Amino acid sequence: MPTPKKGPRLGGSASQQKHLLSNMAASLIEHGAIKTTDAKAKVLRPYIEKIITKAKAGTVADRRAVLKLIPHKDVVAYLFDELAPKFENREGGYTRIIKLENRSGDNAPMSQISLVLEETVTSEANRATRAAASKQAEEAKAEEAEATEAEAEETTEEK
């Protein structure tokens, strides 16, 4: 991963930001969901998405690359062995961010970032119903076209 560019940092220098993201990613993988500020959640999302995509490939080189980013062997082993197969049919969108109430101490906007482990059954069911509806619409259009052609033939025969 490239070093962070110019702009605001989460908690100080680039090295501190790397460590912060590494620890947050490890906690997210270990617990499935973490509660953090909006800014940290928005920065963590692309970071963890890239890591999960590498874990889905599952090669030794990918495992070593992830170990450089998250130096927790047990967490990386859990990611590659148990979590990655759950995301096999998913092309991205492994996390979701849910807005929470502001923190009471400093009124900071809070969010919960969590892994999306549910199957996308609803979207597949929606696709199936849309496909069936489009087939029915095509059949209805074909029937209407046949009816109009039959009417046109009748009117030409009458003349």
Curated annotation (Swiss-Prot):
Gene3D superfamilies: Ribosomal protein L17
InterPro entries linked to this entry: Ribosomal_bL17, Ribosomal_bL17_CS, Ribosomal_bL17_sf
Keyword Ribonucleoprotein assigned: yes
Region of interest (Disordered), residue spans: 124-159
GO molecular function: structural constituent of ribosome
Residue ranges, compositional bias (Acidic residues): 145-159
Highest taxon above the source species: Bacteria
Cellular component aspect of the GO annotation: cytosolic large ribosomal subunit
Keywords tagged on the record: Ribonucleoprotein, Ribosomal protein
Complexes and interactors: Part of the 50S ribosomal subunit. Contacts protein L32.
Protein name (database record): Large ribosomal subunit protein bL17
Encoding gene (name): rplQ
